[in-house]
Amino acid sequence: MAPSLWKGLVGIGLFALAHAAFSAAQHRSYMRLTEKEDESLPIDIVLQTLLAFAVTCYGIVHIAGEFKDMDATSELKNKTFDTLRNHPSFYVFNHRGRVLFRPSDTANSSNQDALSSNTSLKLRKLESLRR
């Protein structure tokens, strides 16, 4: 059937659910005014709620389209073994490997630069404390 029919059915179901909720609220306020708060909802409001819920669910199921198989083999049969566990979104290129596996001559010079800047920073802190 046409998708607009199912969308219309969902719309009618939602409207009926809203009407049932409004009717229940109105019935409750009427019961408060008449001081009969221990009575339950009338059967017509309960039936309208259940029928509207069923109609809405039926329309939503038809709008959703075909369900996928619960068995994973239908999706896995199109994939090769190499692409099965390949998750490129988990690749990390910004990691400590650059520092650990850098040539030794650049590593030593950067360590010396870091040490000299560190000692000058400590000396500046000590000078500010003496004043």
UniProtKB/Swiss-Prot annotation:
Keyword Lipid metabolism: no
Regions of this protein lying in the Lumenal compartment: 23-43
Subcellular localization: Endoplasmic reticulum membrane; Golgi apparatus membrane; Early endosome membrane
Coiled coil: none
Protein keywords: Endoplasmic reticulum, Endosome, Golgi apparatus, Magnesium, Membrane, Phosphoprotein, Transmembrane, Transmembrane helix, Transport
Membrane topology: Multi-pass membrane protein
Chain positions with Phosphoserine modification: 120
GO molecular function: cobalt ion transmembrane transporter activity; ferrous iron transmembrane transporter activity; inorganic cation transmembrane transporter activity; magnesium ion transmembrane transporter activity
Predominant place of localization: endoplasmic reticulum
UniProt topological domain (Cytoplasmic) ranges: 1-3, 64-131
A biological process from GO: copper ion transport
Pfam families linked to this entry: MMgT
Chain segments annotated as transmembrane: 4-22, 44-63
GO cellular component: early endosome; early endosome membrane; EMC complex; endoplasmic reticulum membrane; Golgi apparatus; Golgi membrane; membrane; plasma membrane
Biological role: Part of the endoplasmic reticulum membrane protein complex (EMC) that enables the energy-independent insertion into endoplasmic reticulum membranes of newly synthesized membrane proteins. Preferentially accommodates proteins with transmembrane domains that are weakly hydrophobic or contain destabilizing features such as charged and aromatic residues. Involved in the cotranslational insertion of multi-pass membrane proteins in which stop-transfer membrane-anchor sequences become ER membrane spanning helices.
PANTHER family registered for this protein in UniProt: ER MEMBRANE PROTEIN COMPLEX SUBUNIT 5, PTHR21181
Family per record: Belongs to the membrane magnesium transporter (TC 1.A.67) family.
Assembly: Component of the ER membrane protein complex (EMC).
Name the record gives this protein: ER membrane protein complex subunit 5
Species for this entry: Homo sapiens
